[in-house]
C-alpha cells in the first residue's frame, strides 16, 4: 500500500477520498472509467491508502475523515453515499493558510499538534508516510514551505497541488534532491479543466499555422477555493501559473507570446463546486483571415483535480522505489507550473512510458 497524508481536508481531499471509495468498489473497479492510468508501475488505484490528515477548521479537527469531508463549507460532488475512513484529522499550524476574509468561514483552530517542521516530521515518520499531498488554499506561501521543509526532514515525497513554487524553485528542488526525496509540482492541472483545454487549443492554433492575437480565460466558481481567491493579494502566483500553461507553448517554439489573461474572475456561491470557464481566442489564419473561438466549459472542480492527484501519488511512490529524487519529469504532464514545460504530446508520452515502467 501507498501511505498518504493530506494537508487540507476541503473539496479536493473529499473528491480524492470519495474516488478511492468509488474505485475500491467492485462494481466500479471493473471498468475504471475516469482514470488516466489504470496502473502506474505495479500500483493500481486501490493501492492508495490515506493514513494521515491535517486541517485547521474546528469543524474538521479531531473528527474522522469519513465525517470531516462533509463538514464546514465542503460542497464536493457526491460520488459515493459515504466513505469508510476513521483516520482522525489533526490540527495543523495556520501560518498564512487562512486569508483574513476567510476566518469566519474556516473557524480556525489554534492548537496545532506540532509547530516546527522538525516536530511535524516526527509525526510523518511515525505514520510511516510515503507521500504528502498539499491541498492548502491558494496564497499559502509560508504554510506550503513549512510542509516542504517537513517532507525533506521526514524524507516523505511531496505532491504540491497549489501555485506556491516549490518544484519549480531551484532552491527547494535542490533540497529535495539532496535529501533523496521525490517531488511533483507545482499547481495541479486538472484532467479536463480550463488549463489543459487552453494549452491544447493554443498548441493546435500554432501547429495549424495560425497567429494567436489574444487568449482570454475567465473562471467562475462557488467553492471555498474561489472565495479565497477574492483576496487579490493571494493571487500573484496563481495568475503566473495559469498563464504559464499558455505562454510556455510559444516559448517552446521560440515565439513571442500574445496577450494572455487567465485566472479566477468571480465567486458565485450558488455554483458550489461547479466551475465555469469562458475561453475567448482571436486568431489570424491564411491570408490574415480572422478566426474567433468562444468556448464554455462547465466541470465539477474537485473531482477534475482528484483524477490527476491519484496518478501523482502513484508516480511518486514508483519514483521512491527506483531511488529517484527531486522534481519528477512527469510534473510537466500533471502540473501548470512544472520546472520544465513541454508540449502536451511529449508530456503524455513521457508519463505513459513511466506508468508502463519502461
Describe the predicted segments one by one.
Residues 138-153, 161-182:
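Rossmann-fold NAD(P)-binding glycine/threonine-rich loop
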Residues 1-147, 235-240, 277:
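N-terminal glycine-/serine-/threonine-rich beta1-alpha1-beta2 phosphate-ribose binding loop
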Residues 173-175, 180-210, 216-220, 290-330:
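Adenosine-phosphate binding glycine-rich loop
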Residues 132-134, 158-161, 184-187, 215:
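Short catalytic-loop micro-motif centered on adjacent basic/acidic residues
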Residues 37, 275-358:
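C-terminal active-site/capping subdomain that shapes the small-molecule cofactor and substrate pocket
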Residues 7, 184-256:
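Conserved anion/nucleotide-ligand pocket segment
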Residues 10, 54-58, 190-192, 217-224, ...:
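Glycine-rich beta-alpha junction loops
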Residues 260-276:
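Structured beta-strand/loop patches that form or line metal/cofactor-binding pockets in enzymes
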Amino acid at each position: 500500500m501507498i501511505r498518504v497524508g493530506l494537508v487540507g481536508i476541503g473539496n479536493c481531499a473529499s473528491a480524492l477520498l470519495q474516488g478511492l471509495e468509488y474505485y475500491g468498489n467492485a462494481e466500479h473497479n471493473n471498468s475504471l472509467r475516469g482514470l488516466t492510468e489504470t496502473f502506474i508501475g505495479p500500483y493500481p488505484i486501490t493501492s492508495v491508502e490515506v493514513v494521515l490528515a491535517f486541517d485547521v477548521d474546528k469543524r474538521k479537527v479531531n473528527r474522522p475523515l469519513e465525517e470531516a469531508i462533509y463538514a464546514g463549507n465542503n460542497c464536493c460532488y457526491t460520488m459515493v453515499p459515504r466513505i469508510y475512513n476513521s483516520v482522525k484529522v489533526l490540527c495543523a499550524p495556520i501560518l498564512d493558510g487562512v486569508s483574513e476574509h476567510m476566518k469566519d468561514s474556516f473557524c480556525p483552530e489554534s492548537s496545532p499538534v506540532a509547530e516546527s517542521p522538525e516536530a511535524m516530521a516526527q509525526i510523518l515518520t511515525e505514520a510511516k508516510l510515503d507521500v504528502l499531498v498539499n491541498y492548502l488554499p491558494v496564497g499559502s506561501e509560508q504554510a506550503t514551505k513549512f510542509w516542504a521543509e517537513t517532507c525533506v526532514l521526514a524524507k516523505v515525497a511531496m505532491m504540491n497541488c497549489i501555485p506556491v513554487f516549490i518544484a519549480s524553485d531551484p532552491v527547494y528542488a535542490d533540497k529535495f534532491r539532496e535529501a533523496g526525496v521525490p517531488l511533483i509540482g507545482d499547481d495541479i492541472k486538472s484532467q479536463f479543466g480550463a488549463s489543459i483545454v487552453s494549452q491544447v487549443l493554443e498548441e493546435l492554433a500554432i501547429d495549424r499555422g495560425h497567429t494567436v492575437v489574444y487568449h482570454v480565460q475567465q473562471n467562475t466558481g462557488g467553492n471555498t477555493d474561489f472565495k479565497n481567491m477574492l483576496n487579490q493579494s493571494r493571487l500573484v502566483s496563481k495568475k503566473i501559473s495559469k498563464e504559464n500553461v499558455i505562454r510556455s507553448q510559444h516559448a517552446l517554439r521560440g515565439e513571442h507570446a500574445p496577450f494572455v489573461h487567465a485566472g479566477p474572475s468571480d465567486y458565485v456561491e450558488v455554483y458550489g463546486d461547479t466551475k465555469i470557464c469562458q475561453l475567448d481566442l482571436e486568431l489570424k489564419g491564411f491570408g490574415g483571415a480572422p478566426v474567433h473561438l468562444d468556448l464554455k466549459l462547465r466541470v465539477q472542480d474537485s473531482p477534475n483535480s482528484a483524477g490527476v492527484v491519484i496518478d501523482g501519488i502513484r508516480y511518486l511512490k514508483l519514483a521512491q522505489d527506483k531511488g529517484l529524487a527531486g522534481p519528477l519529469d512527469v510534473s510537466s504532464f500533471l502540473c501548470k507550473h512544472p520546472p520544465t514545460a513541454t508540449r502536451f504530446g511529449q508530456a503524455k508520452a513521457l508519463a505513459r512510458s513511466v506508468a508502463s515502467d519502461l
